[in-house]
C-alpha cells in the first residue's frame, strides 16, 4: 500500500483559504475530546467505530468523491493505523501532532483543568484550543463550507 501523505496545519489553512470544497474532514478522537475542542465543520467518527466496522460505512457515505482528510490528537501513526487496514482508500491525512504545535499562550476562556482528561491530555487540549484561537481564519473558512449531514 502506498504511503499516506501527511498535511500540515498551514497546508490545511491554505486549502481552506482557496475555497476548495472537495474534501471531508474527519475527526477520529473520542466523543469527549470532540466535545471539548474541534475544528468547525469536522465530522466525528471515533477510531473505535472505524476499527469495529460501522465507522467505515459512515465515512464512505460522507465521501461522495471527495478527498478524505483525517485528524486526531496523537498524529503520526494513529490515522495511518486504520488507513492501512485497507478498509478505506485514503488519499490524505492530517497530522494532528503538527496541528498541536500552535501558539502556547494561556487561554482564560478554557478551563486549565478538566476532570475527564489526565494532566498530559489537558496540556495537549490547551495547545489545541490555543491553535484554534490563533487560527480563527481557519475556523471561519471551515464554517463557510457546506454542512455534511449524517
From Swiss-Prot:
Occurrences of domain Rhodanese (ranges): 19-93
Superkingdom assignment: Bacteria
SUPFAM superfamilies hit by this protein: Rhodanese/Cell cycle control phosphatase
SMART domains recorded: RHOD
Protein name, as recorded: Uncharacterized 16.5 kDa protein in psaL 5'region
Organismal lineage: Bacteria, Bacillati, Cyanobacteriota, Cyanophyceae, Synechococcales
Amino acid at each position: 500500500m502506498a504511503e499516506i501523505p501527511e498535511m500540515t496545519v498551514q497546508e490545511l489553512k491554505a486549502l481552506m483559504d482557496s475555497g476548495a470544497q472537495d474534501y471531508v474532514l474527519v475527526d477520529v478522537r473520542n466523543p469527549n475530546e470532540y466535545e471539548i475542542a474541534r475544528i468547525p465543520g469536522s465530522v466525528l467518527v471515533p477510531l473505535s467505530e472505524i476499527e469495529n466496522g460501522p465507522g467505515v460505512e459512515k465515512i464512505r457515505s460522507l465521501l461522495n468523491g471527495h478527498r478524505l482528510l483525517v485528524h486526531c490528537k496523537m498524529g503520526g501513526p494513529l490515522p495511518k493505523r486504520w488507513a492501512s487496514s485497507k478498509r478505506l482508500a485514503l488519499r490524505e491525512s492530517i497530522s494532528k501532532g503538527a496541528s498541536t504545535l500552535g501558539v502556547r499562550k494561556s487561554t482564560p476562556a478554557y478551563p486549565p483543568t478538566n476532570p475527564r482528561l489526565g494532566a498530559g491530555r489537558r496540556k495537549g487540549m490547551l495547545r489545541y484550543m490555543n491553535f484554534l484561537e490563533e487560527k480563527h481564519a481557519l475556523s471561519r473558512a471551515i464554517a463557510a463550507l457546506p454542512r455534511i449531514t449524517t
